[in-house]
Curated annotation (Swiss-Prot):
Tissue expression profile of the protein: Expressed in hypocotyls, cotyledons, leaves and anthers.
Taxonomy of the source species: Eukaryota, Viridiplantae, Streptophyta, Embryophyta, Tracheophyta
Protein name: Zinc transporter ZTP29
Key word rRNA-binding present: no
Transmembrane segments: 7-27, 36-56, 64-84, 124-144, 157-177, 188-208, 220-240, 251-271
Topology class, membrane: Multi-pass membrane protein
Gene source species: Arabidopsis thaliana (Mouse-ear cress)
InterPro entries per the UniProt record, alphabetical: ZIP
Chain ranges on the Cytoplasmic side, renumbered to this chain: 1-6, 57-63, 145-156, 209-219, 272-276
Length: 276
């Protein structure tokens, strides 16, 4: 392993492990109530939607054209929709929630809380997968930036580190709420960030020449479709259920604004020939 590879790997670790910092904000605070959980789920939904549409899908359109990018994007949507058909998912309608609690009393309330936690855990695991898929190409970007020069690599790694803190929150929050385990929340958030150094290793060793830029951009467009689907199918319903539609929508747009600002400053750190 040459020195350039070691530098890129170290920088990607700095950027990737900042998800752990976001997780610390969650695990060092008290377990949120249901409304707070809904607001934070809405915030995380905004983060995910911005990544999907303003980052991954946008770059795919610019790189391979509108038609091909849309084929990849909706291919990702269909692919993940098919997967969710075969994954057992706890469903819970907000309209029946209160009626069941009144009918069954305390025991019913405990049963409903268990279902809530299962549903939130499912959402958290899907979020962790989506964030990992998003972090993977960021590791590739750090590697390519490091090749360009140390200054570019360092600036890019620091920008990604700031960019990844709210992603750590998005992963750790539902895991902590569902499992009540600080370790599980911290561990999964950290693992999602480790996709970045993994991206460095893979792009350096496995795909130095074989993976064409068009295929890579298409795959990232498909990742955007996957993330958009899981946000609209899994995360937003939870946010509406727990926080109410009006408050959840505000949280969504606040999350979108935060991630958009993060993507903007991240873009400023990239050389002119690169984009995320």
């Amino acid at each position: 392993m040459d020195s350039q590879m070691l530098v890129a790997l170290g920088l990607s670790l700095v950027g990737g492990l900042s998800t752990s910092l976001g997780a610390l904000f969650v695990v060092l605070s008290e377990t949120p109530n249901m409304k707070m959980l809904g607001l934070l789920q809405g915030f995380a939904s905004g983060l995910m939607l911005s990544i999907s549409f303003l980052d991954l899908a946008h770059n795919a359109i610019n790189s391979i054209g509108f038609f091909k990018a849309n084929l990849w994007f909706f291919g990702g949507v269909i692919f993940f929709a098919c997967i969710t058909k075969f994954i057992p998912e706890p469903t819970l309608g907000p309209s029946t929630d209160g009626k069941r609690r009144k009918k069954n009393g305390d025991e019913g309330g405990k049963d409903m809380m268990k279902k809530h936690r299962k549903q939130v855990l499912y959402s958290g695991l899907i979020t962790a997968i989506g964030i990992s898929l998003h972090n993977f190409p960021e590791g590739m970007a750090v590697f390519l930036g490091s090749i360009k020069g140390m200054r570019v690599g360092v600036n890019l790694a620091l920008a990604i580190a700031l960019h990844n803190i709210p992603e750590g929150v998005a992963v750790a929050l539902p895991i902590y709420f569902a499992t009540e385990s600080k370790w599980q929340a911290f561990k999964l958030a950290t693992l999602s960030g480790l996709a970045e150094p993994l991206g460095v290793i893979i792009v350096a060793y496995l795909f130095p020449r074989s993976l064409s830029p068009e295929i890579l951009e298409g795959l990232l467009g498909a990742v955007g479709g996957i993330m958009a689907f899981l946000t609209l199918h899994e995360m937003l319903p939870l946010a509406f259920d727990y926080a109410g539609q009006k408050q959840a929508v505000k949280a969504v747009f606040f999350g979108m604004a935060c991630m958009s600002a993060s993507l903007y400053f991240l873009e400023l750190s990239l050389p002119e020939t690169m984009s995320l």
